[in-house]
């Protein structure tokens, strides 16, 4: 069986889920990784692992640092296939180009490491998990609590569905 990864590659808190398909697909059988600039998240929360975003002097260095972090995790787990969430149709703000450039760094490194990439639309992921393609992030979190009795906000120790909970 194979080891797969799912990636939500945002600018402020990229996150990765690693799943070994020899195990049942459940939250507790996955390893989660996220990258944040706040030092308080730079620790392990059971199977959720926070990393500190390295300082950077320009966007290219930022994109390179984040993609190196991600490719290191993918290679450590010998991931050969990744689903990286596609761009949402509503992404029209000025940062859309930065998001695309940032993601291109990672996609290029995955290509160079022979990692297959698929890009499902955000609506596909939401529909799979909640039954509704236009679900909000809180509905995704509620579905996890209802299906698996797992509360990521409680695990990480934050009060609401803000980042990094909403990114995981």
What is each model feature region?
Residues 1-168:
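Phosphate- and other anionic-substrate recognition elements at nucleic-acid/protein interfaces
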């Amino acid at each position: 069986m194979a080891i797969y990864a799912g990636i939500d590659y945002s600018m402020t808190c990229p996150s990765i889920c690693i799943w070994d398909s020899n195990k049942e697909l459940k939250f507790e059988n996955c390893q989660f990784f996220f990258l944040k600039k706040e030092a308080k998240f730079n620790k392990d929360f059971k199977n959720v692992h926070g990393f500190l975003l390295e300082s950077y002097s320009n966007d290219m260095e930022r994109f390179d640092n984040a993609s190196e972090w991600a490719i290191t995790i993918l290679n450590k787990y010998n991931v050969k296939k990744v689903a990286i969430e596609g761009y949402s149709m509503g992404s029209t703000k000025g940062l859309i180009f930065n998001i695309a450039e940032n993601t291109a760094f990672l996609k290029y490194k995955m290509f160079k490491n022979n990692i297959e990439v698929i890009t499902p639309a955000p609506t596909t992921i939401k529909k799979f998990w909640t039954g509704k393609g236009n679900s909000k992030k809180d509905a995704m979190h509620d579905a996890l609590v209802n299906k698996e009795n797992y509360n990521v906000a409680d695990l990480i120790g934050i009060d609401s569905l803000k980042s990094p909970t909403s990114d995981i």
